[in-house]
């Protein structure tokens, strides 16, 4: 019961008190406390938290829907890096995989470490 009251107080505070005191010189003593997006994200997170708590699940702040939108990591695809010496082979020959690339890269005449070859080939 106490947890729900605390959450409701926070939700009401973010929507009912849009201003806080600011002591910066040259500005109005009042400024918006939270941008509307921040307040909306906070309310959304608290609503999800209450729903999970009501279902008996423990809240997991690492799940993307519990984070503020600007904290979510965008889905990034790692671009494929093509090295000139490891170019695609002609038709009929086996295409190199990362293991073959590392084996070639670590030959003594290449003078690369395993870590360097791993970063080159993957």
Curated annotation (Swiss-Prot):
UniProt KW Ribosomal protein keyword: no
Basic and acidic residues composition bias: residue spans: 62-85
Tissues expressed in: Expressed by the venom duct.
Residues cleaved off as propeptide: 23-96
UniProt-annotated location(s): Secreted
Signal sequence interval, chain numbering: 1-22
Gene Ontology molecular function: toxin activity
Domain of life of the native organism: Eukaryota
Region (Disordered): 53-89
Disulfide bond annotation, renumbered to this chain: 101-121, 105-117
Similarity comment: family membership: Belongs to the conotoxin R superfamily.
UniProt note: domains: The cysteine framework is XIV (C-C-C-C).
Protein name: Conotoxin flf14c
Species per Swiss-Prot/TrEMBL record: Conus anabathrum floridanus (Florida cone)
């Amino acid at each position: 019961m106490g947890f729900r009251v605390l959450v409701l107080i926070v939700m009401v505070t973010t929507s009912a008190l849009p201003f806080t005191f600011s002591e910066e010189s040259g500005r109005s003593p009042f400024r918006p406390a939270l941008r509307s997006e921040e307040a909306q994200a906070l309310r959304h997170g608290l609503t999800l938290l209450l729903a999970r708590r009501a279902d008996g699940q423990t809240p997991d702040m690492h799940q993307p829907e519990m984070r503020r939108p600007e904290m979510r990591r965008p889905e990034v695809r790692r671009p494929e890096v093509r090295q000139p010496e490891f170019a695609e082979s002609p038709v009929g020959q086996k295409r190199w995989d990362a293991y073959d690339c590392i084996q070639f890269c670590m030959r003594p005449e290449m003078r690369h470490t395993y870590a360097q070859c791993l970063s080159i080939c993957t």
